[in-house]
């Protein structure tokens, strides 16, 4: 008599496997960011999970279990526009002292506040989103970039599902503190800078100044103002967005230390560099001389 393999016996005791209900919240108007998350959303849906994505850029040819709530038309999508004046017109003194680079670095980040606040002011009254947030989910995925508005709205509607941050690049300067990670500017270059390790003394000095500046800027130019937008719309106080952010369960960053350098991380921040890549094999076209 042949023995019954153990895994066949184990199957008898396995209960039905249920798909997860996943809500994705992506309020940023940059298409390149959404392109980093789409392969993950597609794969989750292909594996049978119930995926609902709130985004400006719904999937084309979505799989069966994927549903999109489009934000298109809610605000202007600036897919191909950039203000080049922030890189022009610097005087000789700024160029000679290197202050022109600092000025440009600061200026190119400032529009992120306008994008975030404009979108947040419209999301608070966006009925399709409020209807979604009244339902129950197993996990909520949301982008961590220039806004905490979705975090606040999830709290307003009493969401209890664990929240997972997604980042299309190395974690932003203001994101690490909420996980208890110290990004020492003496050897951790800003994600948006041109610096690599090791840095010179002047580069470390510039890196430190901008690190402090951007954390303060995000707090006062975006986070507190988004909180005010939410509180004024719903007519009640909510928990500080910074405190809410400390309860996020996990952060997946589309980066890898082989390219971005070694950084101090914790188990709650996981590098998933290359998550945006299409693994489909395609023949390489012949190149003639």
Where are these regions (language model features)?
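Nucleotide-activated sugar donor-binding and catalytic core shared by glycosyltransferases
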Residues: 2, 11-22, 37-50, 192-193, ...
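Conserved catalytic-core segment of nucleotide-activated headgroup transferases in glycan assembly
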Residues: 36-37, 246-247, 261-289
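Short gly/pro/ser/thr-enriched loop/turn and capping motifs at secondary-structure boundaries
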Residues: 60-61, 170-175, 278
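Conserved nucleotide-sugar donor-binding subdomain of glycosyltransferases
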Residues: 85-151, 198-242, 246-247
